[in-house]
Amino acid sequence: MGMRMMFTVFLLVVLATTVVSFTSYRASDGRNAAAKASDLIALTVRDCCSRPPCRWSHPELCS
């Protein structure tokens, strides 16, 4: 292989590695966002259940 061909292969490998790491990073962001939303919902329900007026208005949340 010539020097130019080796350099081209090197650039393709670097590009492929960057694309794979970028997409896996974005996927983990989505999972983290879903976990944070779930935690926020649980915190809101817990806060509602600790206050009697909210608990009486939403008994399905605090059963």
From Swiss-Prot:
Keyword terms, alphabetized: Acetylcholine receptor inhibiting toxin, Disulfide bond, Neurotoxin, Postsynaptic neurotoxin, Secreted, Signal, Toxin
Domain notes: The cysteine framework is I (CC-C-C). Alpha4/7 pattern.
Signal peptide: 1-21
Cellular component, GO annotation: extracellular region; host cell postsynaptic membrane
The species this protein was found in: Conus amadis (Amadis cone)
InterPro entries: Conotoxin_a-typ (IPR009958), Conotoxin_a-typ_CS (IPR018072)
Family according to the record: Belongs to the conotoxin A superfamily.
One Gene Ontology term of the molecular function aspect: acetylcholine receptor inhibitor activity
Official protein name in the record: Alpha-conotoxin-like Am1.6
Pfam families in the record: Toxin_8
PTM comment text: Is not hydroxylated. Contains 2 disulfide bonds.
Disulphide bond pairs: none
Region (Ser-Xaa-Pro motif, crucial for potent interaction with nAChR): 50-52
Compartments (UniProt record): Secreted
Propeptide regions on this chain: 22-46
Coiled-coil positions: none
Role: Alpha-conotoxins act on postsynaptic membranes, they bind to the nicotinic acetylcholine receptors (nAChR) and thus inhibit them.
Tissue: Expressed by the venom duct.
